Amino acid sequence: MHSLSLISLALLSPLLVNAQLSGHVGPLTSSSSKASTKTCNVQDYGAKADKETDIGSAIEKAWDDCAEGGVVYIPSGDYAMSSRLKLSGGKASAIQLDGIIYRTGSDGGNLFMIEHSSDFEFFSSTSQGAIQGLGYEFHKDGSLNGPRLLRFYDVTDFSVHDVALVDSPAFHLSLDTCKNAEIYNMAIRGGDSGGLDGVDIWSENVWVHDVEVTNKDECVTVKSPAKNILVENIYCNWSGGCAMGSLGADTNISDVVYRNVYTWKSNQMYMIKSNGGSGSVSNLVLENFIGHGNAYSLDIDGEWSSMSTVSGDGVQLNNITVRNWKGTEEDGAARGPIKVVCAEKAPCTDITIDDFALWTESGDEQTYSCENGFGSGFCLQDGDGTSSYSTVITETAAPTGYEASSMSNDLSTAFGTDASIPIPTIPTSFFPGATPYSALAGAASGNAAKATSSATASRFRHRRGSH
């Protein structure tokens, strides 16, 4: 799918090659092989699809029997879950969620936490499995103290795919200190409030692709520490937008690529946010972005006032490439499509903005503003960062080629915070003109194995120097 000849690879920039996955991602053993070893059906452990009986104990018992090789199987049906599960250890295991789990109970924490595991898979064989967090029951009273839906800590060689995460009381999906992960074919749908992050990543060697997020905070966001992160075919559908940060002390992020990101009615197309702090971000590519109706477009803000100032001169940003951005922004005079604000004592260096064409939906002018950002393109200045500057450029003519496609599933309004959010169907398209890397599970002639085979093939192609 992205297989290139050695000659073609030699012509690629070092930045693009280096900012790739560092090796294999995803589980080492197929789910079918795990199932043939052992299958632990939660209904054999007391689970009832009555939307009342807590499924937590049944999952724990099934996990105890299948964690060292096998599949915990949750059949189709509606299940209640008042427990907060911490599933620890295990190898060559999987959780197959073909039913729908409804969060009950008022405890915080994590609905599911998987930790210290390897060769793991969390998936639906039908693409109809879901976790319904019913977060509105907290949010209608102004509370964000409910549980996160799905968190991974210290897990290696794993995947999450073909499931929907809906209306989390807090964050939806977090990858904390993990390695060699693949996240794909997902729909995440949250309320119209901050603090309801879609996908948060502070890990190593992670491939996120073909994911739709609706919320009002992070779409797919990289936090520190992180390296070798590839994010592709992302649909931020009335969301906060993709981002990096917030960044604080001892930031350590490198070799990150975002590619094919479509953003509709969100806070930003991409934001890097910090205020003080220390450490660095290096080797970042942001390419093939389409946006419509967003408040901000490219927003690099080293003095972000929405976070408290962190001790330090600032986070050093170096070697950032922004290319092939198209579309429109909400109001280009109030919030221009390019904002690069870097700390005077930690200027941004080696930034390139190329093939960037966005135009305002309101009025007939827009601004490009840069402060202590050095490189090439628009308001950036040449230099090595030894001198400071601040400049604003006003543009009154629409750039050539800014027109861009839209998506047929663009939402007409946000989901609120005081009523249940419906479970969505996982889409089959996440970026205009881009084909998902893997068919939805259960799609091709009802054969989930075809989707699994496609996913496995694409995983092994994504190694350093083979993309």
From Swiss-Prot:
Signal peptide: 1-19
Keyword field contains Signal: yes
Active site: 217 (proton donor), 292
Pfam family, one: Glyco_hydro_28
Organism taxonomic ancestry: Eukaryota, Fungi, Dikarya, Ascomycota, Pezizomycotina
An annotated GO cellular component: extracellular region
PANTHER family: PECTIN LYASE SUPERFAMILY PROTEIN-RELATED, PTHR31736
Annotated disulfide bonds: 40-66, 219-236, 342-348, 370-379
SUPFAM superfamilies in the cross-refs: Pectin lyase-like
Family: Belongs to the glycosyl hydrolase 28 family.
GO terms (BP aspect): cell wall organization; pectin catabolic process
Reactions accelerated catalytically: Endohydrolysis of alpha-D-GalA-(1->2)-alpha-L-Rha glycosidic bond in the rhamnogalacturonan I backbone with initial inversion of anomeric configuration releasing oligosaccharides with beta-D-GalA at the reducing end
Organism: Aspergillus flavus (strain ATCC 200026 / FGSC A1120 / IAM 13836 / NRRL 3357 / JCM 12722 / SRRC 167)
GO molecular function terms attached to this record: polygalacturonase activity; rhamnogalacturonan alpha-L-rhamnopyranosyl-(1->4)-alpha-D-galactopyranosyluronide lyase activity
Keywords noted in UniProt: Carbohydrate metabolism, Cell wall biogenesis/degradation, Disulfide bond, Glycoprotein, Glycosidase, Hydrolase, Polysaccharide degradation, Secreted, Signal
Function text: Pectinolytic enzymes consist of four classes of enzymes: pectine lyase, polygalacturonase, pectin methylesterase and rhamnogalacturonase. Hydrolyzes alpha-D-galacturonopyranosyl-(1,2)-alpha-L-rhamnopyranosyl linkages in the backbone of the hairy regions of pectins.
Record's protein name: Probable rhamnogalacturonase A
Superkingdom, natural source: Eukaryota
Subcellular location: Secreted
Entry-listed glycosylation sites: 237, 252, 319
EC annotation from Swiss-Prot or TrEMBL: 3.2.1.171
Enzyme class of the recorded protein, top EC level: hydrolase
